[in-house]
Amino acid sequence: LGSFRLSTNSTATSDELGIMAVAYFERFGYRAEDVKACIIGSVVPQVMYSITSAIIKYFGVEPLVVGTDVDTGLKFDPRCYETGRLGTDRAVNCIAALEKYGGPFLILDFGTATTLDAVSREGVYLGGCIPAGVQVSIDGLFQKTALLPRVELVKPDTVLSTTAVGQIQAGAVLGYIGAIEYLIRHAKEEIGQPDTKVVATGGLSRLVADNTELIDVVDPQLVLDGLRIIYERARR
């Protein structure tokens, strides 16, 4: 029906969040009273109270919050050292991919940080890794060096650029894609299942997927599908 992205503001009040959400819903042709149910998955504890209060006040529904008391249905390999402590967004991604594509698969979520998660053919979470996101690398260069400029996040035409901007883009973007390809290859080797699918999601998924042959599926709405699946299971 529609989706929108907002930057996180941990100091936003429930009124600010509620008014903003109502305005975005109206842009898609819906009124607040059209909303009959809500589910929230957050990895920013500071905003949970404000978001929950906003949903109750402006939409009149009690949201289901995906937390430790909500069974996502994801199984964990016993070797995982923090079973059940996987970030909400990552667990939700895995549930969605299991339902939509089946295991085995790797999920790469390209956000502020990049996360890679592996799930077996039997639907068991095997582990993952968290490299820094490409935007973090570019911002770090800008903040920690006096003369290097902040640059746009685009793929350059060459590794050997003749400008400072192009060289930063080559190092950050092309270097990042190379690192992602390395992680995919080695994760597949560790899983040992040749038919492992690679699913990309998150804001930068298209940039990476368009420049590598190792990603099978780009699914920008994966986490939203996962939240829907969890809600439907919880309400059965």
PLM regions and their residue ranges:
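Short glycine-rich, Thr/Ser-proximal phosphate-binding strand/loop in the N-terminal lobe
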Residues: L1-F28, G123-P149, V154-T158, G166
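N-terminal glycine/serine-rich phosphate-binding loop of ATP-dependent small-molecule kinases
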Residues: L1-T72
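Adenine-nucleotide phosphate-binding core of ATP-dependent small-molecule kinases
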Residues: F4, T8-S10, P156-K197, I215-V217
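Glycine-rich phosphate-binding loops at beta-strand->alpha-helix junctions
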Residues: G41-M48, D195-I215
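Phosphate-binding/catalytic loop of phosphoryl-transfer enzymes
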Residues: S53, V61-V65, V70-K144, V173-H186
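Conserved phosphate-binding/catalytic loops in two-lobed NTP-binding clefts
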Residues: G60-L74, E213-I229
